[in-house]
Amino acid sequence: MRGFIANSLKPHMRSFALRRSFTSSRILRKVNAVESFGDYNTRISADKVTVVDFYADWCGPCKYLKPFLEKLSEQNQKASFIAVNADKFSDIAQKNGVYALPTMVLFRKGQELDRIVGADVKTLSSLLAKYQE
């Protein structure tokens, strides 16, 4: 099906479709999913600011927030962005006092800097600017 669609597009649209597909996959790699408790600890212990997005697949506001986090990760090269599925890693969520989703927690060197409960992109942007100075 994909080949049929690509072949039926006009040449200039074909390149747009390919470029858009490539760009989306490049951006998606910027918010990395946590694979284990050890992986989580390693990532939040970094010298740079780490934004931890606690989410769940069933959470509507979490889905709304995802593209904004991907865009922020592109714009803030000095910060790292990770995602923790609160259903899969309930122990990590509990350890961090996460009782509402989405919750974003900012860390540096393993220490919590700040926390945002809810899909508040403006506050996250301003906190990133504050802690990256």
Curated annotation (Swiss-Prot):
Location(s), subcellular: Mitochondrion
UniProt cross-references to PROSITE patterns, sorted A to Z: THIOREDOXIN_1, THIOREDOXIN_2
All residue ranges annotated as the Thioredoxin domain in the record: 30-133
Catalytic machinery residues: 59 (nucleophile), 62 (nucleophile)
Biological process annotations from GO: cell redox homeostasis; cellular detoxification
GO annotation, cellular component aspect: mitochondrion
Disruption phenotype: Leads to auxotrophy for arginine and cysteine.
Gene3D superfamilies: Glutaredoxin
Keyword terms, alphabetized: Disulfide bond, Electron transport, Mitochondrion, Redox-active center, Stress response, Transit peptide, Transport
GO molecular function: protein-disulfide reductase activity
Keyword Disulfide bond listed: yes
Annotated site location: Contributes to redox potential value: 60-61
Site positions per UniProt: Deprotonates C-terminal active site Cys: 53
Record's note on what induces expression: By aluminum chloride and ferrous chloride.
Paired cysteines (S-S): 59-62
InterPro entries xrefs: Thioredoxin-like_sf, Thioredoxin_CS, Thioredoxin_domain
Keyword Transit peptide (UniProt): yes
Feature: transit peptide: 1-29
Principal cellular location given in the protein's record: mitochondrion
Quaternary assembly: Interacts with arg3.
Role noted for this protein: Disulfide reductase which serves multiple functions in mitochondria, protecting mitochondrial components against thiol-oxidative damage as a thiol-disulfide oxidoreductase, and supporting urea cycle and respiration in mitochondria in a manner independent of active site thiols.
PANTHER family, A to Z: THIOREDOXIN-LIKE PROTEIN 1
Family according to the record: Belongs to the thioredoxin family.
Name of this chain's protein: Thioredoxin-2, mitochondrial
Gene from which this protein is expressed: trx2
